[in-house]
Curated annotation (Swiss-Prot):
Monomer. Binds 30S ribosomal subunits, but not 50S ribosomal subunits or 70S ribosomes. Its main location: cytoplasm. It comes from Renibacterium salmoninarum (strain ATCC 33209 / DSM 20767 / JCM 11484 / NBRC 15589 / NCIMB 2235). Keywords: Cytoplasm, Ribosome biogenesis. Transmembrane segments: none annotated. The gene is rbfA. This is Ribosome-binding factor A. It is found in: Cytoplasm. It comes from the Bacteria.
Length: 146
């Protein structure tokens, strides 16, 4: 087994190689909208999982997925040519859901800020339930003793 540091370095190198190959060599329609976000390689260096995002709607997403499936062989050949390892890892492309998750989290944060502002406005209008200063003062004790 390879050490995890080597797998991480190899993953970073594969990310660069695949991104460059998509930009320069793959002529499939739809690959111009693909951004490689992350790459992970197993510790035995036999399998690489490549995460990507696509700018555009569902039609662009489907076109990009088809283009990646068709160009997987070209990309694997480029990875093999540019790496100095005995076996070229298999490539698996997975759509990265980070942008959708991030927009959902941003929406939740916006709602929380709105609720905080509403609560602060209520607190500013609120009045004390009892006296303004609920603590006993020394002069109150002297007046009660006399």
């Amino acid at each position: 087994m390879a050490d995890p540091a080597r797998a991480a370095r190899l993953a970073q190198r594969i990310k660069v190689i695949v991104a460059e190959a998509l930009r320069k060599q793959v002529k499939q329609p739809g690959v111009e909208n693909i951004t490689i976000t992350e790459t992970r390689v197993t510790n035995d260096l036999q399998h690489a999982t490549i995460y990507y995002t696509i700018f555009g709607g569902t039609e662009a997403r489907q076109e990009a997925e088809d283009s990646l499936a068709k160009s997987k062989g070209i990309l694997r050949r480029e990875v093999g040519k540019n790496l100095t390892i005995r076996l070229t890892p298999t490539l698996e492309f997975i759509s990265d859901e980070v942008p959708e998750t991030a927009s959902h989290v941003e929406e939740l944060i916006r709602l929380a800020k709105e609720r905080d502002a509403e609560l602060a406005a209520r607190a500013a209008r609120a009045e004390f339930a009892g006296e303004a200063d609920p603590y006993k003062k020394p002069e109150d004790d002297e007046a009660a003793e006399s």
